[in-house]
Regions:
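Switch I (effector-binding) loop of TRAFAC-class P-loop GTPase G-domains
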Residues: 1-12
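Alpha-helical scaffold elements adjacent to nucleotide-binding pockets in ATP/GTP-utilizing enzyme cores
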Residues: 8, 30-33, 37, 54-61, ...
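Conserved catalytic-core segments of large NTP-driven translation/proteostasis enzymes
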Residues: 94-207
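Gly/Ser/Thr-rich beta-alpha loop segments that engage phosphate groups in nucleotides
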Residues: 1, 25, 52, 118, ...
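Fold-independent oxyanion-binding glycine-rich loops
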Residues: 5, 21-23, 45-47, 75, ...
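Conserved Switch II/interswitch segment of TRAFAC-class P-loop GTPases
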Residues: 14-16, 21-27, 35-85
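Short beta-alpha junctions and helix-cap segments that line functional grooves
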Residues: 5-6, 28-31, 54-59, 168-170, ...
Length: 207
């Protein structure tokens, strides 16, 4: 992954927003912008190979942001899978990166992304990803947003639609966003520009 990708799904009474982020330090700015948008991180680890070298950078930044991880041991269906060793390697990596006791107390999910299965144990896999989604709902804290005050939204990436124009993708930090409102955008240099919100959209799946 070079640029972040967004997705979203509804699960029960909750909405889960998912952002895939680059793993390499060469894209550090992109990584830090994305981590400022999320409330937790889901680390996929190969059931044979364990944590990859590029895992260190993103994970260390996640810990610096105070995020608590969820670990999924992926490709558990491979013949050479060694889940116990992989979890030990993950714990050792987290400890080396200075994780707090709370961050070291992470839930582990076992599964196969290709098969769409997950469970609490390598020998107890459910027929879908229900277990993983339940872990996300139960582990990830709700976003802290004050509905009072003027709208404040952090834009982390821009897209373009031929019918709508420029799309700002980000997270509302304060207030409520409505179509038709007049807003001011502020650049990194502090320059303000007046504009209007034409539409408010959210992701449905990958769209």
């Amino acid at each position: 992954t070079i640029l972040s990708k967004n997705a979203a799904l509804n699960w029960g009474e909750f909405r889960i927003n998912i952002v895939d982020t680059p793993g390499h330090s060469d894209f550090g700015g992109e990584v830090e912008r994305i981590l400022s948008m999320v409330d937790s991180v889901l680390l996929l680890v190969d059931a044979v190979e364990g944590p990859m070298p590029q895992t260190r950078y993103v994970t260390s930044k996640a810990f610096e942001n105070g995020l608590r991880p969820i670990v999924m041991v992926n490709k558990i269906d491979r013949d050479a899978s060694r889940p116990d060793w992989v979890v030990d390697q993950v714990f050792e990596l987290f400890d080396q990166l200075g994780a707090t006791e709370e961050q070291l107390d992470f839930p582990v999910v076992y599964g196969s992304a290709i098969q769409g299965i997950a469970g609490p144990d390598p020998d107890e896999l459910h027929g879908d990803l229900t277990y993983l989604l339940d872990v996300i709902v139960n582990h990830v804290p709700a976003p802290e947003v004050s509905l009072d005050g003027l709208l404040q939204m952090q834009i982390t990436s821009l897209a373009y639609d031929q019918y709508v124009g420029v799309l700002g993708v980000g997270r509302v930090k304060r207030g409520v966003i409505n179509a038709g409102e007049t807003i001011f955008t502020v650049s990194d240099e502090g320059k303000q520009k007046k504009g209007k919100i034409l539409q408010v959209m959210s992701y449905a799946g990958l769209e």
